[in-house]
């Protein structure tokens, strides 16, 4: 049987869907936002076809199962303060629709399409610039996504203004990777590591000039702490620490290659893949004496 149910307003339809939904799952934030965009378009006498097209593009790029994750990271990428409390869910986007876009659902949809393109580009490391591609590959090997919002924020600002260019992005990602990795090597907890992420977000989203963005990042640099951490035992049998060791080894391997080359390893990675027991590679011969190698 097919049952047709009609309600008087969207709020009632959302509640009814939760009751009747055969999956037993509530509507996701992505479901609610999509319907709210259609409702806003109807209220402002805008054609819904553009919203449908934009949303289809987002789903094709990001994937339906990752939509809520993308929307969360996108919302984080828009933060203008260091408050770690993120306004949750659907209401945050509705507030943004009214305040930033004056109810223009089409403009907001197109903005989300652009952000989804940048998010996908980061996940797939689809950059032609060799230095940028190398830094993104290194950050991706950590197996976390806390570094993605500031990178998205920089790319989104590049797309909507002429403040930054590709060379600026290369310098930004180089500075950010170095300082962010300081926190990992010093075994900082997540909230401490994220401080540089939030500082970068505040600088980018409050329209600070490029030099100020870099200065905000470099304020979190700790070269002496980083050097001291190198003498500590890095390995611990925890997933994050294992990912860190893997990321460091692969980053060392990248530095031995031409910038245009990023090798991919499958299966188990051991230290001998990167730091050979035999001192035969020119890279190591030029940098270490035999007694240092031993």
Which residues does each predicted region cover?
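Long, basic N-terminal domains or extensions that often function
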Residues: 1-2
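Short cysteine-rich loop/turn motifs with clustered Cys
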Residues: 246-269
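Noncatalytic, beta-rich nucleic-acid-contacting surfaces in large DNA/RNA-processing enzymes
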Residues: 202, 258-259, 274-275
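A cross-family structural signal marking well-folded subdomains
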Residues: 30-34, 38-249
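Histidine-centered nuclease catalytic patch
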Residues: 263-294
């Amino acid at each position: 049987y097919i049952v047709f149910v009609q309600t008087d307003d969207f709020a009632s339809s959302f509640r009814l869907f939760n009751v009747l939904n055969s999956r037993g799952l509530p509507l996701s934030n992505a479901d609610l936002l999509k319907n709210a965009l259609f409702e806003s378009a109807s209220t402002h006498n805008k054609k819904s076809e553009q919203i449908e097209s934009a949303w289809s593009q987002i789903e094709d790029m990001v994937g339906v199962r990752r939509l809520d994750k993308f929307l969360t990271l996108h919302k984080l990428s828009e933060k203008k303060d260091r408050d770690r409390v993120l306004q949750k869910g659907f209401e945050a986007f509705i507030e943004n629709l009214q305040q930033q876009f004056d109810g223009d659902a089409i403009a907001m949809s197109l903005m989300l399409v652009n952000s989804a393109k940048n998010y996908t580009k980061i996940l797939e490391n689809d950059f032609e610039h060799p230095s940028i591609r190398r830094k993104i590959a290194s950050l991706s090997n950590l197996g976390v996504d806390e570094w993605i919002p500031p990178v998205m924020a920089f790319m989104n600002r590049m797309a909507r203004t002429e403040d930054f260019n590709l060379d600026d992005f290369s310098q930004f990602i180089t500075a950010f990777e170095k300082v962010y990795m300081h926190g990992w090597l010093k075994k900082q907890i997540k909230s401490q590591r994220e401080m540089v992420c939030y500082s970068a977000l505040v600088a980018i989203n409050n329209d600070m000039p490029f030099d100020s963005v870099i200065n905000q990042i470099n304020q979190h640099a700790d070269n002496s702490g980083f050097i001291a951490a190198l003498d500590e035992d890095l390995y611990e049998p925890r997933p994050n620490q294992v990912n860190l060791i893997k990321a460091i080894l692969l980053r060392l391997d990248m530095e031995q290659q031409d910038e245009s080359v990023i090798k991919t390893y499958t299966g188990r990675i051991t230290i001998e893949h990167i730091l050979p027991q035999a001192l035969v590679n020119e890279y190591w011969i030029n940098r270490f004496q035999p007694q240092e190698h031993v």
